[in-house]
Amino acid sequence: MSSLASQLKSISDKSASIALNRQQRSKIHSRSLIFDPKVAASQDYDEIYDVAIDALDELCELDSRFNKFKNSLFANDSINFDRNVQSEDVVTQLDQNINAFFTLLGPYYNFTAALRASEWLVRRFQANMHNLEYMILTALPYYMQPVFIKILNVIPKQNIPQIFEWLVTAKDQLRSPTLQVCFRAFFNDNHLFTFYSSFLDEQIKRNTTYKEQLVFYLSITIQLLPASNKNTLNETLIPVVLRSSDLMLTSKNSSLRLGAYSVLAVLSAVAPLSIELLNTLTFAVLANDIALEAQFAKQTVFLLIQLWTSTTELTTSEALSKTPSLPINIIEHIDISQAKKDKFLAIYFSSIFPSETSLQLLNMIELKGNKRMFKFVVHTVLSSLKPQHLNGGVTSNNNSTNYKDTILDIVRKLIKLDQATFDEMLKSFRLTVSELELTLEGSLLATHSGDEKLDEFGDNVDRDDDTEYTKFVDERQDDKEDGDENTKFDISKLGASAPTYLDSKYNPEFYKLSFAFTRFCSKVDIKSQRAAILHFTHKVFQNPALSITFFVKSGIIFGCSIYMVKNTADGKTDFYLVLPLLLIAFNDPSSHIRAAFAQLVQLVSEITKAIHENKKKQKTLLFFESEVYANSAEKKMISPQDAIKLFAFIGSLDGMRLEEGKIATLLKSIFNGKFDKKTLGSLYQTFILNQWAQPSLPIVIKQRVWSISSQLNEMGVNGVRTYFWDTDIKPYLAKREEWLVQAKEAKLADYYNIVEKSLVQLVGGDHLSAEDSNSVSHWLCQALDSNTSLQLVANERITSIFPKLTSVESKVIILSKLVDLLVSDDYVEFDPMITLQSLPLDSAVFLQILENVKIGDQMPEQGVVKRRRRSSSSTKQAMAKSDMTNLASQHLRKLSIILEVLEVNLRKASIANPKLLKVLFKILSDLDYLGNDGNLPILYAQEVLASCLLLSISELKNSNHKHQLDSNSVRADLIVNSLRNSSSPQVQNRLLLVISELATLAPEIILHSVMPIFTFMGAHTIRQDDEFSNDALQKTVARVIPALASTNSGSFTTEIEFLLASFTAAFKHIPSHRRVRLFVALTKTLKPSNSMHILIYLLGEQYYQAKMQKNALEMRDIETFVTAYLKAFAVETQLNGLDQFSNLLNELPRHQLEENSKIYDQLRSRPIFGLAVVNSTTEELLKKRHALLEYLNSVLELDSANFDVTSLKSRIDIALKESSENDTLVLPQIRHMTSFALSELDIYTNTEPHPEISAELFVMLTSLVDLLPVVKFVESITEFLDVDKLGDNTAIKVGRNYAVLAARKFENEISLTLESVVENFSDLDKLFIVLLKGIERNVDLELQQAYLNLFAVITSKLGVDAGLTAKFSSVLIKSLGVITTSSGLLSSESEIVIASISAIVSIVNVLGIKTLGLFPKIIPPTLKIWEQTTTTTTATTTRSISATKIGRDEQNESSKLVQESVLLLLSCYIKKMPSFMVTTLDSVILTILNSDLTESQIKSSIMNLIIDRVNIGQVFKSLCSVWTQRQFYQSKNPASLGLYLNSMESTINKLEKREAISEATVFMKWLIQAFEFRDYSEKLGPPIRYQHYSSYGKFFPFVCYCLCHETQRMESSFHSCAIAYVMKLNDKSFRPLFANLVRWAIDGDNSIHDVAKTSRLLSFYRFFNKLQELLKSIVTSYYSYLVDATSECLKSFASEEDKGNKDATTLRRIVLISLSLSFTFDQDEYWSQQGRFDSICQPLLDQLSNIEESIGKFLVKTITNFVSDISSKEHSEVVLKGLVKFISYDTENLSNTKIWTIRTLKSIFQKMGEQWLSYLPILVPHIAELLEDDDEAVEIEVREGLVRVIEKVLGEPLDRYLS
């Protein structure tokens, strides 16, 4: 861009927000982020600031950094800040602040507060023009969201920089750009990417980056790098990317670091990077310590692999060499190719070699098949050594020396991988293997392991060892002479003094020689070690036997050992005694050890065979005899021949050589094998195990012996454990510490598993005798006392061998010990309770152990009387002693534990028996004794005991055997006693369950305790709010009641009544949510036929008690419960229960009973009646009967109130429909209850009158009959409705009740279908006849009304089905003739009239047009009836105030109901026959509107119905006719007038345009009269409802206000109707009407009333103003009809003729508003036409001469709009001259005139701005004069108002011009 272009661009940017005209300023100001442009254009800065500052506060809550902008961009004085007049430095600082704000705003664009705060920067500082780059850059990450489009939308298109031109399309289309569009823009413009990256770099430096920005940058960069060509990458992208990545890596933001990793990984994949750059990047990545922390380690390693595998070179990294702590273990699990892993590992290996991790790194590299990488690694290793020959030796550098062993292992591995290549590389370094070995001080080619050496020695036993040994001695002598360092170790000083090393007491000497032996061998070359060992043996040990004990114990056996045996063999020495010790080695895990010992056994076998085979007897020396049996008094040995057989059986030992653990199987075969002699197996067993059991053997041998022997014991080999019992097992506990010391010396790490476990496994096993079992139990109990790990082993052994113990005593010993451990406070390594519960125990064990903890043994007690609790008077004193209490407490704890174990076993196995049950009952009694007399905590023990009792009884009950229980021990009274004494609900519930189970097992035991049980449950259990109590209660009842029933006792009913009485007595204490389920389960258990009615009655008794106490809440609870309770049963069960309840009511005495009478005794003995009933007085009995009936009715009513399938009524209907057989289950009960109700009704109506009981009986009767379905119901009530059978008042009352009930029943019926009625057509037809006959007879007013209502309801239901309508149409037509007579519609009683209308409505709804023949008999009489209601109302309103207050409600209530009924009938005819209602439509509308007693909502709905159903044109004519001809406007009810106007507006809205045009004349006539309504109403005075306030002067202003308000509201409705009508007309049809309206307003043409001109003009201008607001410029030209009239009005206002006239002031205000609207909406320069201008200009300006204060602002606005509207300069000058006249001192003007003129000029300057600055020379002199005006108000108005506005427009002070 040229210099000139740059300067022009800069100037353009700076002046972008400067507007030279009003339209441009408005356009700039209307650009908004949150407001519509039209709204934004009208806003001032104060409003925008308020919105923005609230948003800033929200942002400050999100980020406190926004607070700093409160004193700059969002300061209070920023409202008046204008950047266009500021200095360059101020503007620069402003831009920096705005850019900083947008930078900080980036993360929060999704919050609405962000845009609302940005609104201030856009609107006040034009940030959308001057700071648009930052707006776009910060919002660009949100390119897919609407907020980005909003930001683009406020940026002017011409201001968008060229770098963002690609966003213009998105701005034009208001559509978000896609990611592909963004990428294409960055791809095509490298400068854009550089620009955005620079912006991001600045964000990173300021720590203002955010997630969306980083995601956007990465998505663009990662796509851009692979898509760019090589030149672009190298020249542009890579430098930019690397700069940004470097900043990201130095940041502490984890997201930025990971973003840099992503970019660098992609970069390394698309472009080859130099080694120098790779090192630089690696340094940058690892520079921050967090790179290798847990959260970044994996990503860091992955990136490093990507970077260093991107190059083709294999080289050492300087950067990686500085990082020896790289977490290489991550590389193994990282998801990347193996080739890349190997390459990176090789580079890293080379970079840090040598180090601690070098060998680990090498093991991770796959070098096979990759010769290049192998050479690279070898080169690294050899280069690090740098060998130099110094003094004949070879050494390496210091670093290599530090890791000599590691390098040695690495070199060996490399040689093993590829020796040929390694040798090749050695040659290139001019090195040999020997030199390398010297450097590393180790052998490189010795690859044989120690085990292989051992095999080698074993395989070469036949070599000439004498020669080798001689050679070794000679060499050693030469070395000694040469002064070799080996001479420092002199074995001649070592001397073995012990006779054998198989005795543990010689352990110190053994360990000393072992150390010396190891040290000696380490000094000898590997090839000479065998000879060295022979030399050591020869020099140190006295004889070969001693040396063998040394090697056997140490576990070291070489070829030299075989050599010693072989050399010792002289044909006279037997070696077979050593066989048992040699066999121990076959348990060693090492196969080489096992192989070596196998060779040794084979050698001994060969020697033995050589000596004794084919020879009878030969005396030989037993090798090893003294060593093995040194301390043994008895030597168990075998003969040589038996030894040969044993060797033959053992065979080659190949299996043991190859597989570990085979020795035990071999020994089992030997011990159980069949030889020539039957006892040979046991002989071998004795021989081997006797030697193994020698107590002197050290721990290293013993641990293997015990391991093998324990395996044999587990295999079931008999007698194995006996060999070790006395020598090892029995004394083990005493010698354990000694064994531990030996194990520590022998470095046996895991003593628990290696030694102790094997030993304890020898304790017990199969084939135990009773005595052995006891011994085993005692030893294990002693082991449990050890407080060491031995406890764990002993516990495990107890678990495994417990079933094998043969005596009960031995089991009890163990159980007692475990219980003691639990009771004691000592620490135990295991949980004894788990062990106890896992042991299989039988009843004999439990009987024995329970006997041991029996309390009777510790505390003697007196004999117990059967079924009586023992006395505690003598024992409390004894229990008071502390030692006795402690002892009892101890035994209680033991008992609790044993009972817990018993409970577990009862659940697992069948161990229950009567003996155990007897003991448990004895314990139950003892626990009760301890709890009451000893005050001990027995609750838990009782609970566990109850569980044991329950399980035992259940098991006995379910067994196939019949058990005889001891009734003296197993007693229910003991359980009841514990129940009463226990305070624990859990114990009580479990004991109840025990009773329930005992009732099924032995019913006779619990029979005598039933009453106490029931009493307890009613007093305690039933009140508990938990599932367990509820379950226990139900199970107890379920088991006890059948037990009672099975006894065939005559008191069974009494027992049930007693049980239910006990339970219901606690009803209020039972949790409410458990009541229903509890009593339902109880009823089902007792059988509903036995208990439901009793329960209902007992709850009725409680209802009576609550009523007497006036406890309504409790009464309601009982009603609700019984309702829910009944729903849980089948319908026939419910009815049966209610029926039996009525029987109990019948049994209730009617009068007070005589004492000792028969019925007295009968009722007294029944728990449900008792003394409370038999001792009641007659009055009390009547109250109780009334309460019980009320209770029953409440229940039935509450049940039927819920219309669902669970109600009794619905279920009866379903049952009767399902099957006809159900009739016999349902109907008899209802008939029986109905008979009861009728009989009782007769008694308490006629015989013993009692109105309250009679009323309840009527309700009961109604409820019972209501239960039946409609069909059955009709059948049952018809005879009760026949007037011929209603002989007395009671029958009439019953008939009325049935009629009401029937109406309600039919009303609730969902529908009547033809199918459901046809079957019972005769019944329904008969019902119609009965009803019509009752209507005609007029027997009783209430009865006749009920019949009419019933008829109406049934008829309405018939209309649902077309078939029913046709079937009954003739009956319904006939009924209309009856209903329209004096017996119905023409009756003098309003109740009958209302009911008749209801019946007529139902018939018309059903038959419709078929009733047209009776139209004259219905509509005209109905309208007359309505007129009678208005006459009554009028008479009421004309009475005195006092009379109105007294009787208004009573007299008007019936009239109101009649009016509503009439309106209902009219609406019915409008629905069914709308076309036939047209003839009377005027009357109908008047009837609806004048029904003042009816609610407006009802009248409104009927009027809407007329508008919807009747021809709309006819409706419109009728509405106009009602107003103009029927003079409805004279109505005194404003609500009716409002309803009329609403209906008129709705009609007009629905009217078609064609009809509107045709009826325009009619409407104009109506409109003129409507406009005259104001004047008419004001002359008429207040409506009737306000007239009575006229005598109260203080209320009269309120009356006037209400009148004015209602008049204005109706006038507004007139305008709405008029405008709605005008909108349906065109210009051609409306102009004549408008001209007529103007003539009426001006001249009074077509005026009906004598209305003043001012009033007419008021009405007209009000209407015309609303028309202008709606149609705007469309009606501007209509002003031609009234320009002159308006001018005349203005002149009259200015002439002060009407000054002080309120109407004139109002008219003046409305005329000014009218002119202002016309000026505002003028778009065709209508008022610029000279004639119109002349006729309106001066009259308008003249208003300033006498304008009222209240309307001055309207004049100012009108003149201002007038000046703005006129376009020519001449017109403006005319206006200016006219205004100057009113402020000039050449003419006399009032101060008020000057002030309003000044305000007008101020408003003009504010609106016209610079356009009026040209008139400033004319105004300045006058302004100067006004500033010196005598009136201070004038001076202030000029100085504070006009001058400031002019200065703001002028841009400089006015003082210079004024001076």
Curated annotation (Swiss-Prot):
Its GO CC terms?
90S preribosome; membrane; small-subunit processome; t-UTP complex
Primary location class: nucleus
Q: Which GO terms describe its molecular function?
A: snoRNA binding
**What InterPro entries does UniProt report for this protein, alphabetically?**
ARM-like (IPR011989), ARM-type_fold (IPR016024), BP28_C_dom (IPR012954), HEAT_type_2 (IPR021133), HEAT_Utp10/HEAT1 (IPR056473), U3snoRNP10_N (IPR022125), UTP10 (IPR040191)
Keyword tags: Membrane, Nucleus, Repeat, Ribonucleoprotein, Ribosome biogenesis, rRNA processing, Transmembrane, Transmembrane helix
Q: Which GO terms describe its biological process?
A: maturation of SSU-rRNA from tricistronic rRNA transcript (SSU-rRNA, 5.8S rRNA, LSU-rRNA); positive regulation of transcription by RNA polymerase I
What parts of the sequence cross the membrane? 258-278, 1392-1412
Subunit structure, as described in the record: Component of the ribosomal small subunit (SSU) processome.
Give the function comment from the record: Involved in nucleolar processing of pre-18S ribosomal RNA. Involved in ribosome biosynthesis.
| Designated name of the protein | U3 small nucleolar RNA-associated protein 10
Give the species. Answer: Lodderomyces elongisporus (strain ATCC 11503 / CBS 2605 / JCM 1781 / NBRC 1676 / NRRL YB-4239) (Yeast)
The record's gene field reads UTP10
